[in-house]
């Protein structure tokens, strides 16, 4: 009687492969989350630049600041208010009112997110 050799992997081989995969994951996962955070910060910076440019265009066209954030949408300076990538909502933007009594309205806009960016500055101060 000939004994047939079973096909498959031994327990040692499986453990070695699992150890290699575990090592690769410990390297890759932190980098993935850092890249995700960097992407969210980039989106936030771009959204703020677009909104601030829309506020400036509104002021240049009408010599007044928009009274509320929705005025930028109503007057078609932006199609819609972007979703804050950190709060995941479009209504959490905080506005800075104009200090000039002759030109009241939204002078600047910031994120409503808590926490700090990768550079250590508060997201709400961007």
Where are each of the predicted segments found?
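Residues in soluble alpha-helical coiled-coils and helical-bundle/repeat scaffolds
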Residues: 6, 19, 23, 60-63
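Short amphipathic alpha-helical interaction patches enriched in hydrophobic/aromatic residues
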Residues: 28-31, 36, 55, 59
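Alpha-helical hydrophobic helix detector
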Residues: 15-31
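Low-complexity, acidic interaction segments enriched in glycine
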Residues: 46-126
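Aliphatic-rich helix starts adjacent to a transmembrane/signal segment
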Residues: 31-48
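N-terminal leader/signal peptides at the extreme start of proteins
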Residues: 1-7
